[in-house]
Amino acid sequence: MLPVIIAGAGPVGLALALALSRHGVPSVVLDGSDEGVVRRAARTCVLPPDVAHWARLPGLVEETTTWTGWRTTVRGKVVEEAVFTEERSPIHLPQHALEEALWRAVGRTGLVELLSPARLVDLEQHESGVTAHLKETPAGDSPSRRGSHLVGCDGARSTVRKLLGVAFPGRTAVERYAVAALRGGVPDTGEAALHRALPAPRRTGGARAEPPEVLVRPLAGGTVRLDWPLPPEENPVTPDALLERVERTLVGLNDGELPPHELLDTGVYACHQRLARWWRSGRVLLAGDAAHLVGALGTQQVAEGLRDVDNLAWKLAADRRPGGAEGLLESYAEERRGAVGARLRAVDQALPVIRGRGGRGGRLTGRGRLTLPADAHLGRGALGEPGRYAIPGQRDRTAEGGPLLGNPVTDVAVTALDGERGRLVDRLGGPLLLVLTAPGARVWDARHWLSAGLMPDLAGAVAALPLPAELLVTDAYPGAPAHTLLVVRPDGRLAAALPGADRRALERCVGDLTDLPVG
């Protein structure tokens, strides 16, 4: 069995290798970096609920933190507050911790071969797969590798993208930030916060310092990350200027006093807006930084890359089955490029509103301008929602008020046919999930309902589907009446809500969804 070749051993490349292994698909990861995992306390990532499962890797829990809530303040006055439940809170963690956990996880699969150093220099496509030509391969290794597909997860300067001749249009440095990670010094409320026009101390001589804007995001272990947007015309930030910014911010957050603190890391980074013109050429695809760059106004590049992984892995697995699934691979490019493109447009529209840099931003007033900067952090609106995919062959809703298709599934308690109980989101990333709403299912002994009502026929229908699927039962699902069969894609998107007794509707749905013959 030919493996999938993955160019790039960053978080997206490693996550894709791990996701493919869960479908039984082998992969070869080409690590062209000489650095290994770079440990930077100020380089972190925020994972929204739809990709939070990546923070549950073994050994990673102690490196993560969830926030109890959110506050937006302007000149010290709270203009917006939100409370997070543990299930709906974003997860914040150092990026190096995520990468190290992924390295450990792929090493345990037995299905992932890591080549390091291994630099891709050329690729060839043929009818049965792809050949990758390599440079600087490990001693004794072949200078070329064959695979069923090749996925470029090799960063913003992607070799794969360049070999395909794919344009990467967009804008450079739409925002610049200074950033610091420190231990102590910030009141430990458990909340993340955006402070705009933070009250600042007076300079020597009585003049008040320019009030800064700062984003405060707690990390595990009593550490915190601070981000300050920089004016586009500002000169390079010196270490002394950054230290002054840290101290001025801490004084503003602590009623005029500078508390004890330990500065762990500092830096300056730029946010770019770019989108590859196309993401697929035959058996070669792009994902992560190779396909898109986001990050302004709190949008999360790592999270978008992990959404690429969740969307692509099961489709690659399906395309390797007899007959292939050409339509599924094309849907990856359509769905993910469309979602990221919408995010980039939202940032372009919001930047002048929030920063007041020309256009209508300087004239816009009211509460919307005060709360818009929090949208990406709260998973709200075009800046923050995970995006919705159009589902082939399905209407938007099964009925008025029914569950909205194409969105991330709502997590509910489920029971498997073997009686095992758990949460729906914990079963994502593997087979297609078929969830029957059956009031009282958690109360009854599974031995009684497994052979009753719709279950025997449904179990037979599931066994006849052209790709692996698992039948689950839940008491209820928001918006779905009793005896509704919910079709949940491996990436956690709700694909259909069907009458539980309609086997033909299920077969049509799966055929439309997978591009594979059914029945």
Task: Map each language-model feature to its residues.
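FAD/FMN-dependent oxidoreductases across multiple families
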Residues: 237-304, 339, 343-346
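Core beta-strand elements of the Rossmann-like FAD/NAD(P) dinucleotide-binding domain
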Residues: 139-149
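Glycine-rich FAD pyrophosphate-binding loop
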Residues: 21-42
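Conserved FAD-binding catalytic core of PHBH/FMO-like flavoproteins
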Residues: 149, 153-271
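N-terminal Rossmann-fold NAD(P) dinucleotide-binding loop
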Residues: 13-14
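Active-site-adjacent segment of FAD-dependent monooxygenases/related oxidoreductases
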Residues: 39-107
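A conserved short coil-to-beta-strand element within the FAD-binding core of flavoproteins
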Residues: 116-130
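Helical substrate-recognition/capping region of FAD-dependent monooxygenase/halogenase enzymes
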Residues: 2-3, 7, 18-23, 32, ...
